[in-house]
From Swiss-Prot:
Native source species: Saccharomyces cerevisiae (strain ATCC 204508 / S288c)
Protein name as catalogued: Casein kinase II subunit alpha'
Biological process annotations from GO: DNA damage response; donor selection; maturation of SSU-rRNA; nucleolar large rRNA transcription by RNA polymerase I; regulation of cell cycle; regulation of ribosomal protein gene transcription by RNA polymerase II; regulation of transcription by RNA polymerase I; regulation of transcription by RNA polymerase III
Coiled coil region boundaries: none
Listed SUPFAM superfamilies: Protein kinase-like (PK-like) (SSF56112)
PANTHER family reported for this sequence: CASEIN KINASE II SUBUNIT ALPHA (PTHR24054:SF27)
């Protein structure tokens, strides 16, 4: 078997954790499906077909504009990539071309390049998103059931294709409530999963980082994305946005431990032969695991037992114990009728 990409991730000498599902999704496909190290053949579109209307956002790796295709007058989103290693750009392009057309994955229309700077831009479908800070507080239980099912469908699809998103958070989940349409966007941190590879833990956004990233467990897998889903769900249900609000990466794990317990954290580390990194020496205290009822108040009308049980099965230290996307969709919360 050819070695998976090696510059960003390393094949490990000691395999201590392998995904419970879809572990060989990449191995079962030809090497050109996942190997972005050799470069990617790009079918460049014409940049003159698109015009920028206005800027709608910027991230670490890109600037995002609303735009229009002048050929068919269709609105679109134009993501102009900032100059980074070509390997990272190749990875995003390969992942997007593999996934586009999949359920609830943002549609990639075209890839164009500025003639002078050679900087690539990605042309995506436009979603009339309502900001989560406005939208989520309006959700009733049937809305949570519907939209989280849509999100889990997207995740189960990308996982089945051997791809971890690695940056699931409200800002990357576009929802158009009029059309009841959800799209998972921003695949810039996504990566192909290969068993026994040590992955970079500097991924995901702080409030949605799984404990595995915070304790330098490099052999993580798709289950990382399910922790992030659990964080989103807990924030909505317990009316606490974000649910775990650390002031730094080490403090993020402390915030998690105040809820899930320190003894349980040490048990997790022990199982995988890891030690708490030294940056926790002065900040990690002996926290007792809290019951989820601790977060239920007269305000948390959505915190029915079924959804709390789902949260409990997603927010687990041990990534192997978390529900997979498919298992989560089969959870009783999604089968219960709410008014």
């Amino acid at each position: 078997m050819p070695l998976p990409p090696s510059t960003l991730n390393q094949k490990s000498n000691r395999v201590y954790s392998v995904a419970r599902v879809y572990k060989n999704a990449c191995e079962e496909r030809p090497q050109e499906y996942w190997d972005y190290e050799q470069g990617v053949t790009i079918d460049w579109g014409k940049i003159s077909n698109y015009e920028i209307i206005n800027k709608i956002g910027r991230g670490k790796y890109s600037e995002v504009f609303s735009g229009r295709c002048i050929v068919n007058n269709q609105k679109c989103v134009i993501k102009v990539l900032k100059p980074v290693k070509m390997k990272k750009i190749y990875r995003e392009l390969k992942i997007l071309t593999n996934l586009t057309g999949g359920p609830n994955v943002v549609g990639l229309y075209d890839i164009v390049q500025d003639a002078d700077s050679k900087i690539p831009a990605l042309i995506f479908e436009e979603i009339k998103n309502v900001d989560f800070r406005t939208l989520y507080p309006t959700f009733k239980l049937p809305d949570i059931q519907y939209y989280f099912t849509q999100l889990l469908i997207a995740l189960d699809y990308c996982h089945s294709m051997g791809i971890m998103h690695r940056d699931v958070k409200p800002q990357n989940v576009m929802i158009d409530p009029t059309e009841r349409k959800l799209r998972l966007i921003d695949w810039g941190l996504a990566e192909f999963y290969h068993p026994g590879v040590d992955y970079n833990v500097r991924v995901a956004s702080r409030y949605h980082k799984g404990p595995e990233l915070l304790v330098n467990l490099n052999q993580y897998d798709y289950s990382l994305d399910l922790w992030s889903v659990g964080c989103m769900l807990a924030a909505i249900v317990f009316k606490k946005e974000p649910f775990f609000k650390g002031s730094s990466n080490p403090d993020q794990l402390v915030k998690i431990a105040t809820v899930l317990g320190t003894k349980e954290l040490l048990g997790y580390l022990g199982k995988y032969g890891l030690h708490l990194p030294s940056e926790y020496d002065n900040i990690m205290r002996d926290f007792t695991k809290k019951s989820w009822t601790h977060f239920i108040t007269s305000e948390t009308k959505l915190a029915v037992p079924e959804v709390v049980d789902l949260i409990d099965n997603l927010l687990r230290y041990d990534h192997q114990e978390r529900l997979t996307a498919k298992e989560a969709m089969d959870h009783k919360f999604f089968k219960t009728k709410f008014e």
